[in-house]
């Protein structure tokens, strides 16, 4: 089982390609080599202007086993949401195709080859990669409002390892529960 988390958007600049090997090779943990410099510029521009920017972090769990989670009270999605939304500055979460699922027809959304569910159906992992995205708000401490001192213009890079850790905690908790139940 492997957990990857990376920036897919900083401010208004988003990446389209995911290169998992590139994540640890850049300061903002972007996954798109071509968008990285634009994302970095977005942060530097915000800093120069005395402002801040937020972003979106994508989290992928590869090789997650089937059957983690419960259908009602201990859904895997609910536990990930609770853990990840407890991180300061996280303002939203989506799984798989997320909010865009509201605009799809059932025949489009239920395509098992495309993993629109993000690896979780009915609160239980289905063996596909688990895919989540979390929205990170821009820091509120900015020079534009007269706040002095050192403040990060973007906390997305700092939030990524925290998101990985919270994801790992929930995953291990469900692995232990599953192992106990399946004895």
Regions flagged by a language model, labelled:
Residues 131-183:
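Internal helix-turn-beta structural module
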């Amino acid at each position: 089982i492997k957990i990857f988390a990376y920036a897919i958007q900083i401010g208004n600049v988003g990446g389209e390609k995911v290169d998992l090997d590139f994540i640890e090779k850049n300061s903002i943990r972007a996954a798109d080599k071509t968008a990285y410099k634009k994302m970095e510029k977005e942060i530097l521009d915000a800093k120069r202007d005395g402002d801040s920017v937020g972003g979106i972090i994508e989290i992928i769990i590869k090789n997650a086993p089937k059957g983690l989670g419960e259908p009602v009270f201990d859904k895997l999605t609910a536990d990930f949401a609770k853990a990840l939304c407890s991180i300061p500055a996280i303002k939203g979460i989506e799984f798989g195709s997320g909010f865009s699922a509201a605009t799809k027809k059932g025949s489009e959304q239920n395509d098992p080859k495309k993993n629109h569910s993000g690896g979780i159906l009915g609160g239980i992992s289905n063996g596909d990669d688990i895919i989540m995205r979390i929205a990170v708000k821009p820091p509120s401490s900015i020079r534009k409002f007269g706040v002095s001192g050192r403040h990060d213009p973007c906390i997305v890079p700092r939030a990524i390892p925290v998101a990985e850790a919270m994801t790992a905690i929930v995953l291990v908790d469900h692995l232990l529960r599953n192992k106990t139940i399946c004895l």
